[in-house]
A protein has these predicted regions:
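Donor/substrate-binding cores of folate-linked one-carbon enzymes
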Residues: 5, 26-30, 37, 86-205, ...
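An anion-binding loop in the catalytic cleft
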Residues: 219-319
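N-terminal Rossmann-like dinucleotide-binding module
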Residues: 1-44
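Short beta->alpha connector loops
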Residues: 13-16, 68-71, 92-94
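Amphipathic, non-transmembrane alpha-helical secondary structure
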Residues: 18, 22-26, 77-80, 98, ...
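N-terminal glycine-/serine-/threonine-rich beta1-alpha1-beta2 phosphate-ribose binding loop
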Residues: 37, 41-83
Length: 319
C-alpha cells in the first residue's frame, strides 16, 4: 500500500532554505535526512559556525549529514541506505550529481527564486531587482544535469515593490517557496502534477555578483543606480569612494527633479538625506550610509560626525 506522503532527503544550507524545511516538518512530510554544508570558520575570531539549516534541523530533532563534497562515493552509499522517494533541494550551494538525482523514484525537486526560464543561476533575486523587473517569483522544478533547466512543477508570481531590497525580497520568496513546495511534492507524488518543460530559447541567466559590479558608476541613470543599491542591500552593499575611503550606500530614492551637478556631485546634504547628481541629470536621495570600519547609519547621524565634511560640491567616486 502506498504511503500518504513521500519520504524525502532535504538538501539546504542558508537562511533561505529554513522556511521550506520547516514547512515539510509542519506538514508531516517525513524528512529522513538533512544534508547541509560543513561548519565553517567565520568572523574576526574565526570561530567554527554551523550553517543555519543545521541549527534548525538539530533543534527539530532531524539527523544531519555534512559531506565536504557530494562527489565522494561515501555520499551515495550513505544516502542509499534511506528508502526515500525524492530529494528536495533548496539553496544547497553545490551542484547535485546525476547519480544522486537518479537514485530516488521522483528524482530531485528544487526551489528556485525566479520565474524560470528567466534568471537561471546563482543570483536570481539580485539580478531581477538590478534589471528593474516589476515582478519575480518562485519556481518548483525537477533537477536535470543543466543549470536550473529542468521541467517545472509549479510557479507563483510576486510584484517587486519600489522599496524592495535583496533582504526584503529574499525573505518574501523564501516563505513563498515553502508554501508552494509542499503541495507540489504531494501532488507530484500522487501523479496529479505533470512536469512542464522549460522554453530554453527564453532562458536568461543570473551569474553571481562580482565585486566590480558593486562600485557605483555615477554616470549611469538614477534608476539604474537605485536598482543596483537595492539589489545588493544588505550584502555585499553598493559603494563609492569618499575622502579616500569606501562609503557604502543604502536606502536610495529617485527624486524626479533635474539637477545641474556633475555625476557623483553632492548637491544637498540635509537631515533627510544626501542628494547626489547622476548621469541622466536626475537626483538620487541617499538615506543611509556606512563608512569603512563603521556601522550602517542614517545619513543625518553620519552628518553629525565624520560626515560633516560631506558638503555640497563634493564629488563621490574615484578612489
Amino acid at each position: 500500500m502506498k504511503q500518504d506522503f513521500p519520504k524525502v532527503i532535504f538538501f539546504g544550507t542558508p537562511e533561505f532554505a529554513i522556511p521550506s524545511l520547516k514547512a515539510l516538518v509542519e506538514r508531516k512530510i517525513p524528512v529522513e535526512l538533512v544534508v547541509t554544508r560543513p561548519d565553517r570558520k567565520k568572523g574576526r575570531g574565526q570561530k567554527l559556525s554551523a550553517p543555519p539549516v543545521k541549527e534548525f534541523a538539530t533543534e527539530a530533532g532531524l539527523e544531519c549529514y555534512q559531506p565536504e563534497t557530494l562527489k565522494d562515493p561515501e555520499v551515495m552509499e550513505k544516502l542509499g541506505k534511506y528508502e526515500s522517494d525524492c530529494l528536495v533541494i533548496v539553496a544547497y550551494g553545490q551542484l547535485i550529481p546525476r547519480e544522486l538525482i537518479e537514485m530516488t523514484p521522483l528524482g530531485a525537486i528544487n526551489v528556485h527564486p525566479s520565474l524560470l526560464p528567466k534568471y537561471r543561476g546563482a543570483a536570481p533575486i539580485q539580478r531581477a531587482i538590478m534589471t528593474g523587473e516589476s515582478e519575480t517569483g518562485v519556481t518548483i522544478m525537477l533537477l536535470d544535469e543543466g543549470m536550473d533547466s529542468g521541467p517545472i512543477l509549479s510557479q507563483e508570481k510576486i510584484a517587486i515593490k519600489s522599496d524592495d531590497t535583496l533582504g526584503i525580497l529574499h525573505d518574501k520568496l523564501a516563505q513563498m517557496g515553502a508554501e508552494i513546495l509542499v503541495d507540489a511534492i504531494k501532488n507530484y507524488y500522487r501523479g496529479e502534477l505533470n512536469p512542464v518543460p522549460q522554453d530554453h530559447e527564453k532562458a536568461t541567466f543570473a551569474p553571481a555578483i562580482s565585486k566590480s559590479e558593486c562600485l557605483i558608476d555615477w554616470t549611469r541613470s538614477s534608476e539604474d543606480i537605485c536598482n543596483l543599491i537595492r539589489a545588493i542591500d544588505p550584502v555585499p552593499g553598493a559603494y563609492t569612494y569618499w575622502d579616500g575611503k569606501i562609503l557604502k550606500i543604502f536606502s536610495p530614492r529617485v527624486e524626479k527633479i533635474e539637477l545641474g551637478g556633475k555625476p557623483g556631485e553632492v548637491v544637498e546634504a540635509a537631515p533627510h538625506g544626501l542628494l547626489v547628481a547622476t548621469g541622466d541629470g536626475i537626483g538620487l536621495r541617499i538615506n543611509e550610509v556606512q563608512l569603512a570600519g563603521q556601522r550602517r547609519m542614517k545619513f543625518a547621524e553620519f552628518a553629525r560626525g565624520k560626515g560633516k565634511k560631506l558638503i555640497p560640491g563634493t564629488i563621490l567616486g574615484g578612489e
